[in-house]
C-alpha cells in the first residue's frame, strides 16, 4: 500500500466473519512457522527489528474472527499465507542475492522510507489533525487520512490524531493491515473474500480478466500501477512471497496468481 493508487474512502463494514469460522489463527500458523516465514525481520539492518511479533499478530487476528478461520483448512491457510505475502512485499528489505533469498526478508520496515508528503486530502469526514502526517506505516503501509480514519474507527483507536501508533504499537499495526484485508471498498471486494473463495466476479470483472485468485488481491492493493500491462517485477515479488509461505504451511497456491492481464478496478 506504500505505492497504492488512491483508494476512495468508504465506511465499509469489517468482515468480521465470512462463511464458517473456526478457532484462532494460531491453529493455522505456529510461532515457528511465523518465524520461518519472516526469517530476517529482526535483522540488525531492518528498521522494524523487534517490532513485529507473533503474539501481536495473533492478538490482532483475534479481533477479526473470520481471518484464517473461514472455509476449508486449505482456504484458511491461503488466507494467512496471502496476507503475510502481500504485506511482506510492502515491507520487504530483501534483494535478489539476499541471504536465504529475497523472500525471507518480509516485515523489515514499519514505516515508509523518506516520506516527504503528509498524505492529507481535505475531508469533512476524515479531517487531518494539525501537524499529523499519514504516510505509509505498518504491514500494509497504511497511508492517507481517508484510510487512517476508517481503520481507526473500526479498531477503536483515533488514528487521525495518533497515526504514529501504527508504527509504535505492534498490535494496532497488525490490526490496521487486517482491517484493510477484511474490508471491501466498492467496487473492490475484500482480499479475504477473494482468497477464501467467497467472492464471485461480476460480468464486468470477468470482462476485465479478474478471476478469483491471488492476482486479484494484488489488483485490489496496487492494481493501478502493477496490473494490466504484462509482466511486472512487483507482481512477481508478491507471488514469490506467497509461494514460499504456502509451501511452509503445506497448501497449494490455487489458480490465477498474477494480474498481468487484468484491468485495474475503476
From Swiss-Prot:
CDD domains in UniProt: chitinase_GH19
Protein name: Basic endochitinase C
Cystine bridges: 46-108, 120-128, 246-259
Temperature sensitivity of activity: Enzyme activity is retained almost fully under 40 degrees Celsius and completely destroyed at 70 degrees Celsius. At 60 degrees Celsius the activity was 15-30% compared to the untreated enzyme.
Signal sequence annotation: 1-23
Gene source species: Secale cereale
Presence of the UniProt keyword Cell cycle in the record: no
GO biological process, one term: polysaccharide catabolic process
Amino acid at each position: 500500500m506504500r505505492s497504492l493508487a488512491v483508494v476512495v474512502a468508504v465506511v465499509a463494514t469489517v468482515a468480521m466473519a465470512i462463511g464458517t469460522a473456526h478457532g484462532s489463527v494460531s491453529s493455522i500458523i505456529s510461532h515457528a512457522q511465523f518465524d520461518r516465514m519472516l526469517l530476517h525481520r529482526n535483522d540488525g539492518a531492518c528498521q522494524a527489528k523487534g517490532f513485529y511479533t507473533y503474539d501481536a499478530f495473533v492478538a490482532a487476528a483475534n479481533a477479526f474472527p473470520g481471518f484464517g478461520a473461514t472455509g476449508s483448512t486449505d482456504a484458511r491457510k491461503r488466507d494467512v499465507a496471502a496476507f503475510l505475502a502481500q504485506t511482506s512485499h510492502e515491507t520487504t528489505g530483501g534483494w535478489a542475492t539476499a541471504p536465504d533469498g529475497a523472500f525471507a526478508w518480509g516485515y523489515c520496515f514499519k514505516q515508509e522510507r523518506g516520506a516527504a508528503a503528509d498524505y492529507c486530502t481535505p475531508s469533512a469526514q476524515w479531517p487531518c489533525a494539525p501537524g499529523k502526517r499519514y504516510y505509509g506505516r505498518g504491514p500494509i503501509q497504511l497511508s492517507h487520512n481517508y484510510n487512517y480514519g476508517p481503520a481507526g474507527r473500526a479498531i477503536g483507536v483515533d488514528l487521525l490524531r495518533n497515526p504514529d501508533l501504527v508504527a509504535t504499537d505492534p498490535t494496532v499495526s497488525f490490526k490496521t493491515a487486517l482491517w484493510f484485508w477484511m474490508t471491501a471498498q466498492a467496487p473492490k471486494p475484500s482480499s479475504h473474500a477473494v482468497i477464501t473463495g467467497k467472492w464471485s466476479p461480476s460480468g464486468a470483472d470477468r470482462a476485465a480478466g479478474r478471476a478469483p485468485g491471488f492476482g486479484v488481491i494484488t489488483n485490489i492493493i496496487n492494481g493501478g500501477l502493477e496490473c494490466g500491462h504484462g509482466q511486472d517485477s512487483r507482481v512477481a515479488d508478491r507471488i514469490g512471497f506467497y509461494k514460499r509461505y504456502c509451501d511452509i504451511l503445506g497448501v497449494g497456491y490455487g489458480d490465477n496468481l498474477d494480474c498481468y492481464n487484468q484491468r485495474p478496478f475503476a
